[in-house]
Amino acid sequence: MDSLIRTFSNAQSSRDGYQLAQTLSPDLPQQQLQAIWKSCGHHDAQNVIKRGIQNSTSGFEKLPKDEVQGWSDVYLAYWKAIGELLPALNQAPQSSWTKVYDAWKELLSALYRGYIGQGFEAWSIPCLYVVAKNLRFFALKADEERNNNVAAGDTSGQIFQDDFDPESEQNQKLEDCARQLNRIFTLCLNDRAPLEESRKWGIYYIINLLFKTYFKLNSASLSKNILKTLSAYRGDMPPLSAFPKSQQVTFKYYEGVLCFLEENYFQAEEHLTQAWSLCHKDAMKNKELILTYLVPCHLLTTHTLPSQKLLEPYPRLQKLFLPLSNCIKKGELHAFDLALQQGEDEFVKRRIYLTLERGRDIALRNLLRKVFIAGGFEESKVEGGPRVRRTRIPVAEFAAAISLGSKQMLETDEIECLMANMIYKNLMKGYIARERGFVVLSKSGAFPGTGV
């Protein structure tokens, strides 16, 4: 405890929030955690901690009485949390990650009270980062432990009730964690202090934790409420560019994914591209996550495919996208359907299945383009003039290509419907002359963006 109090004193004198946050970390060597736990007992912990904090700040500007009490409550809660954490780490009998979570939640509540009414200053907000981040980790551990116990038939911790639904409590602690993080979000957002000493500087870290939590709970839509609230307060906020790049990247990634899930692909591409450009060159996992959504976005917004060079550093993305890309490029409809089917589980898991399914339109466009090119040229109507591509294509030729490509026999009406859809989506320029059984294509740019 003496070592911890000394670090607290140094952090207070230098106003170093990150050094202060390390005194609340559970990620210390077990030997160090054990030493903190054994430094006092239940009967004297409160007095030992309070006396240590009072004495530690006597050499410089003394902390106000309320703030001393606030930090004493925080470190008492931390000491109690260590008492639950050590048995859980050692898998001792009667230990429980639920107990760890509940004790750590008390630590976060003590910090919250410190900022609300005991004078904690904004420079110390990294303490919120460390405690909030680990609250989420302990929530995941507690839910995992509980679900494993239920699967093993141990229901001793459950209250028996007729309508008990095991699935409703699978993420019980993580859902509670989301509520605690929301309190911290509001704590930062509603700070009315001048910006240079405002808790608003902690808001994007907490927002990013909330995004991760909501996505883990499969409640991504709740993230939109955060964005709406943030938008309403944006005039009172520091610009995003003033925050650490790591926080900018994470925020832009989730903002892009949310737009992606709402099928707002142009905005999604904009946010994801910003995240990609800000991402550190060696953060390969983060870049892979960004590309998971940026590649399908780009496919729909620009009708272009990822290059082999782009995907080369990411074997998992190659496995995901290259089979589909090859089928789209060659206009192979049946092979595209098979590749989509084979990767369905992974695509659904990553929430990109429906978007990639639309890539079939690009494959169909490339197939129809082949028919157009194979049609060759017509002699110019002007003597000596250059030959021009045949632009009046019989529907039957397109029908034959589509039937061969998809390995399905389609009726003429279905073919015409597909063609009309391509024209409507501006993947092909022209019109259908039904009476004559022709598709009349534009003489300039029959297939926009393809150079034909």
UniProtKB/Swiss-Prot annotation:
Q: Name one GO molecular function term.
A: double-stranded DNA binding
Q: Which SMART domains match?
A: PAM
| A Pfam short name | PCI
- Residues in PCI domain copies: 249-446
Q: Which InterPro entries does the protein's record reference?
A: Csn12-like, PCI_dom, WH-like_DNA-bd_sf
Family in the record: Belongs to the CSN12 family.
- Which PANTHER family does UniProt cross-reference here? PCI DOMAIN-CONTAINING PROTEIN 2, UNCHARACTERIZED PROTEASOME COMPONENT REGION PCI-CONTAINING
Q: What is this protein called?
A: Protein CSN12 homolog
Species for this entry: Neurospora crassa (strain ATCC 24698 / 74-OR23-1A / CBS 708.71 / DSM 1257 / FGSC 987)
What is the primary gene name for this protein? csn-8
